[in-house]
UniProtKB/Swiss-Prot annotation:
Leader sequence segment: none
Protein name per UniProt: Pre-mRNA-splicing factor syf1 homolog
TM annotation in the entry: none
Bias (Acidic residues): 812-834
Organism: Drosophila melanogaster
């Protein structure tokens, strides 16, 4: 290796042979940054002095190159990495930064690296000067790159005064970061300054929190800060701030009141804190806020009491004053707990002072305290406004008067009632209730005349005509049409007045047209008690003219009952006229009772023919669900009077008019009647008629009844006919179900259903054609006849197997479910019952196969399944007859 030395400008430079090409390039291009950087990269692994020398030479030629300065400073910082801050090399690097800033003072990256490097040396003052110089040298648009490092520096070391001043300068440029300043102040225990900053941002309506906190959350932080640190926050008026929050944030009153009280507690001003708690529970308007304040208040009193008791117990020289102080604190705590319900009631009344129920509850809480009760009632009736009252206002006046009455102050009670009748209630019923309660109080005091006079005052007619429902008039002017007042007036007249005055009251009620059916009934009973029967009947008739159905039902009931009790059958024509008048417009739901009463009258005092006529009319006049019962009564009465045969017409009419459900039962009863009379054929015809509305799947009881009837009174022919009808009805209902399903599908499927419907007739014609072909083929084949003609029992011959073999099977045969098996079982029962007839024939056995053969043969002849229409004639007999 050869070392060459170049002397120039008193600078001796030693370089190796490998450096010669780079040196030559530099000589040729001394002002080329690219060639210097290439040389620096070549010397990257050389000793520090060699690299630094190349950098120094480059910067001497190109002092304005930011790239060379940045790389040089980064290289020098790497060289001191791992060394202690007192190493001389640190000063060399600092000197390099200072020389760089002579040319690069507008480059923020250089200042940032210098500031971070100085911070790592823990030289506080010099670092602060560096950051200050950077802020002065750089334009304000680039200060945002310096401040984070500056703030990180002042927070890293414990220098609160410096940090406060730095933050204040920073917030002038970035006021939105005040929350970070507040956090630092709390960490540095500078709570007074923190409270001031928080108060400032809370008052600033344009402040937007970077952490997403609302103004309300910031306010809560301020309250917590100033209330929990009363000895460290001196610059703010805590009481004024929190009270301002009470006016501003009405949904957090409980928390704010507790914060204010807590401030005075921590300040040692316990009496002032107690005053705050008392003020709070007397002003909050929600149960939630009251609960928060009351719990804190109770806890404060309890802790105060316990601490004082501990102090007295620990002090051996405790005096009587100490014991008195303990007793005072204990009394305060007990008094607070006793007042809890009253205080809560006060909160609810502050929410709505027109809540009548809460006023009543407050009176209950003042039990055994007459003065407080009177004061509460007085305040209540003065506070509650009639149009805003929640509840019944008149109950306050009534209970107030009853309280005086219970304590023997009747005159005061009368004064209260008098005042209560002058209140402008919303409804007339409220005023009427006050008058009625007043009259009842007079009755309890045995002042009957006074009670009657009160009712006379209440019902006095006004000078001009006033409508009851005219809200523009006062309730006092409309009271004369109150039914409640008139009803009580009538009761009082009945009890303490004369017949004439009581009758006048009832007549006046009727004239005003405010009576009810009950008033009419009471009036009639009153007249009857005094033996004015015709007057009573006229009263009933007046009521009937005033009311319509169904309200007039009770009047007619009383009228007719009383009339029949008195006259019975002596005035039959008049009674008939009354019943006809009653039933003329009587609705079906009320007709049954009156028709039965009418019929009973005719039975007992009139003609049987008239009674039957009434029953006949009743069957069509009552409700549909009562028609069945009415027909049963009609039939029973007809049987008693005329005998069973006369009931046939009634049964026939019932079957025609009753709905299906009841018609079935009526048909069965009719058939049983005919059976009793020995008319078996008529009974069978009734069963056949009823069977058309009896689906075998639903009304199995009916078919079982018919079967039992045939077993007792029929023969094989009738049994087979019954089974045929059963299959026919079953097929009919199946067809109806299929039709409904088809209609449903056509509705849902639209065009597809239309296409399917068009294909239906073609398919049916195809089936009919196949059936005709099968019938023609079957006629060409010989069919052996049975040796003997058995009437209605299918027998088996030697040719039976051949018949079954030659029978043409129809693949489109209709299956009627299990009717075939049922048919075979029923046929077996018929054979057992008719053994006398079967003994005349040869040995006969019935099998499913033969039944199938007969079914197929009948199908071949009729072109449809034989079981659908049924037949009692064997197939071979039909063929022979045809031949």
């Amino acid at each position: 290796m050869v070392t060459k030395t170049i002397k120039s400008l008193n600078l001796e430079i030693n370089f190796e042979v490998e450096d010669v090409p780079y040196e030559e390039e530099i000589l040729r291009n001394a002002y080329s940054v690219k060639h210097w950087l290439r040389y620096i990269d070549h010397k990257a692994k050389a000793p520090n002095n060699g690299v630094n020398m190349v950098y120094e030479r480059a910067l001497k030629e190109l002092p304005g190159s930011y790239k060379i300065w940045h790389n040089y400073l980064r290289t020098r910082r790497k060289q001191v990495r791992g060394k202690i801050p007192t190493d001389p090399m640190y000063e060399e690097v600092n000197s390099a930064f200072e020389r760089a800033l002579v040319f690069m003072h507008k480059m923020p990256r250089i200042w940032m690296d210098y500031g971070a490097f100085m911070t790592s040396q823990c030289k506080i003052t010099r670092t602060r000067h560096v950051f200050d110089r950077a802020l002065r040298a750089l334009p304000i648009t680039q200060h945002g790159r310096i401040w984070p490092l500056y703030l990180q520096f002042v927070r890293r070391f414990e220098m609160p005064e410096t940090a406060l001043r730095v933050y204040r300068r920073y917030l002038k440029l970035f006021p939105e970061d005040t929350e970070e300043y507040v956090d630092y102040l709390q960490e540095a225990d500078r709570l007074d300054e923190a409270a001031q900053q928080l108060a400032h941002i809370v008052d600033n309506e344009h402040f937007v929190s970077k952490h997403g906190k609302s103004n309300h959350q910031l306010w809560n932080e301020l309250c917590d800060l100033i209330s929990k640190n009363p000895h460290k926050v001196h610059s703010l008026n805590v009481d004024a701030i929190i009270r301002g929050g009470l006016r501003r944030y009405t949904d957090q009153l409980g928390h704010l009141w507790n914060s204010l009280a807590d401030y005075y507690v921590r300040s040692g001003l316990f009496d002032r804190a107690r005053d705050i708690y008392e003020e709070a529970i007397q002003t909050v308007t929600t149960v939630r806020d009251f609960t928060q304040v009351f719990d804190e208040y109770a806890q404060f009193e309890e802790l105060s009491l316990n601490r004082r008791m501990e102090q007295v117990a620990a002090n051996e020289a405790a005096t009587e004053e100490d014991d008195i102080d303990v007793e005072l604190r204990l009394s305060r705590f007990e008094y607070l707990m006793e007042r809890r319900l009253l205080l809560l009631n006060s909160v609810l009344l502050r929410q709505n002072p027109h809540n009548v129920h809460e006023w009543h509850k407050r009176v209950t809480l003042y039990e055994d305290k007459p003065a407080e009760i009177i004061s509460t009632y007085t305040e209540a009736v003065q506070t509650v406004q009639p149009k805003q009252a929640v509840g019944k206002l008149h109950t306050l006046w009534v209970e107030f008067a009853k309280f005086y009455e219970a304590n023997g102050q009747v005159e005061d009670a009368r004064v209260v009632f008098e005042r209560g009748t002058e209140v402008e209630y919303v409804k007339v019923e409220d005023l009427a209730a006050v008058w009625c309660e007043w009259a009842e109080m007079e009755l309890r005091q045995q002042q009957f005349e006074a009670a009657l006079k009160l009712m006379q005052r209440a019902t006095a007619m006004p000078k001009r005509k006033i409508a009851y429902y005219d809200d523009t008039e006062t309730v006092q002017a409309r009271l004369h049409r109150s039914l409640k007042v008139w009803s009580m007036y009538a009761d009082l007249e009945e009890s303490f007045g004369t017949f004439k005055t009581c009758k006048a009251v009832y007549e006046r009620i009727i004239d005003l047209k405010i009576c009810t059916p009950q008033i009419i009934i009471n009036y009639g009973m009153f007249l009857e008690e005094h033996n004015y029967f015709e007057e009573a009947y006229r009263a009933y008739e007046k009521g009937i003219s005033l009311f319509k159905w169904p309200n007039v039902y009770d009047i007619w009931n009383s009228y007719l009952t009383k009339f029949l009790e008195r006259y019975g059958g002596t005035k039959l024509e008049r009674a008939r006229d009354l019943f006809e008048q009653c039933l003329d417009q009587c609705p079906p739901e009320h007709a049954k009772y009156f028709y039965l009463l009418y019929a009973k009258l005719e039975e007992e005092h009139g003609l049987a023919r008239h009674a039957m006529s009434v029953y006949d009319r009743a069957t069509s006049a009552v409700k549909e669900d009562e028609m069945f019962d009415m027909y049963n009564i009609f039939i029973k009465k007809a049987a008693e009077i005329y005998g069973l045969p006369r009931t046939r017409e009634i049964y026939e009419k019932a079957i025609e008019s009753l709905p299906e459900q009841n018609m079935r039962h009526m048909c069965v009863k009719f058939a049983e009647l005919e059976t009793k009379l020995g008319e078996v054929d008529r009974a069978r015809a009734i069963y056949a008629h009823c069977s058309q509305v009896c689906d075998p799947r639903i009304t199995a009881d009916f078919w079982q009844t018919w079967k039992e009837f045939e077993v007792r009174h029929g023969n094989e022919d009738t049994m087979r006919e019954m089974l045929r009808i059963k299959r026919s009805v079953q097929a009919t209902y199946n067809t109806q179900v299929n039709m409904m399903a088809a209609q449903f599908l056509s509705t849902n499927n639209g065009a597809a259903a239309d296409a399917g419907a068009g294909a239906g007739p073609d398919a049916m014609r195809l089936l009919e054609e196949k059936a005709r072909q099968a019938a023609a083929e079957s006629k060409q084949k010989p069919i052996e006849k049975a040796a003997s003609n058995i009437m209605f029992v299918r027998g088996e011959t030697q040719g039976g197997a051949k018949d079954k073999k030659d029978t043409v099977v129809n693949p489109d045969e209709i299956d009627i479910g299990d009717s075939d098996e049922d048919d075979e079982e029923e046929d077996d029962d018929e054979e057992n019952e008719m053994t006398n007839e079967n003994q005349a024939s040869a040995a006969v056995t019935k099998t499913d196969e033969e039944g199938l053969v007969m079914k197929k043969l009948r199908f071949e002849q009729k072109a449809i399944p034989a079981k659908v229409f049924g037949s009692l004639k064997p197939s071979n007999q039909g063929d022979s007859d045809g031949e």
